[in-house]
């Protein structure tokens, strides 16, 4: 079940706090609509993400979730623990560079040890950026304001994108 929830989050791009607040009424005309909790106090912005086949399949699978909730949710800690376990079982253990919050130094850690719900949002934004390369368009789907500095933390120019850019010089 938590694998499905993580995949849903990967194709919707919302924060886990917003995922928990989604209800069946959040689905409007084939899209999920919500006001991000993090920005509710500022200028409320309605985020609308069209549902793809994967998201629709997951919603259908859990259509009988009790109450008005769109999907079954567990506590943040249990969800993050489940994500780490899923990554371990799937063999997603490649080393990644992270910033140690205590020392402020870069360090290598296995992906399965650092994976969390926020990785789904990073995947959503990063995968869209590889396809579209338009931060303003992607920002409309992720809830980032135009020119957002926070958005820059999510997009990654990977090796394939670097190769593609260099071929433009020829």
How would you label these PLM feature ranges?
Residues 1-2, 75, 79, 117, ...:
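Hydrophobic (often cysteine-bearing) scaffold residues that line and stabilize catalytic clefts
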Residues 1-16, 20, 77-78:
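Basic, Lys/Arg- and aromatic-enriched nucleic-acid-binding interface segment
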Residues 12, 21-60:
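Conserved tyrosine-mediated DNA breakage-rejoining catalytic core shared by Y-recombinases
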Residues 38-40, 79, 142-167:
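Catalytic-site neighborhood detector that most strongly recognizes the C-terminal catalytic loop/helix
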Residues 45-57, 61, 152-170:
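DNA/chromatin major-groove-contacting recognition/catalytic segments
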Residues 64-69, 84-140, 144:
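Short, basic (Lys/Arg/His-rich) helix/loop patches that form interaction surfaces
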């Amino acid at each position: 079940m938590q694998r499905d929830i993580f995949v849903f989050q990967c194709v919707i791009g919302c924060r886990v706090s917003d995922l928990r607040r989604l209800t069946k009424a959040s689905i409007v005309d084939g899209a999920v609509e919500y006001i991000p909790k993090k920005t509710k106090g500022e200028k409320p912005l309605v985020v609308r993400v069209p549902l793809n086949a994967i998201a629709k399949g997951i919603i259908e699978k859990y259509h009988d979730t009790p109450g008005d909730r769109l999907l079954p949710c567990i506590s943040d800690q249990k969800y993050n623990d489940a994500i780490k376990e899923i990554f371990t079982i799937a063999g997603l253990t490649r080393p990644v560079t992270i910033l140690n919050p205590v020392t402020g130094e870069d360090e290598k850690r296995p992906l399965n040890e650092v994976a969390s719900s926020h990785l789904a949002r990073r995947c959503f934004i990063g995968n869209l950026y590889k396809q579209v390369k338009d931060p303003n368009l992607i920002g409309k789907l992720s809830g980032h304001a135009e020119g957002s500095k926070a958005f820059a933390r999510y997009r990654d120019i990977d090796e394939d994108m670097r190769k593609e850019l260099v071929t433009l010089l020829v």
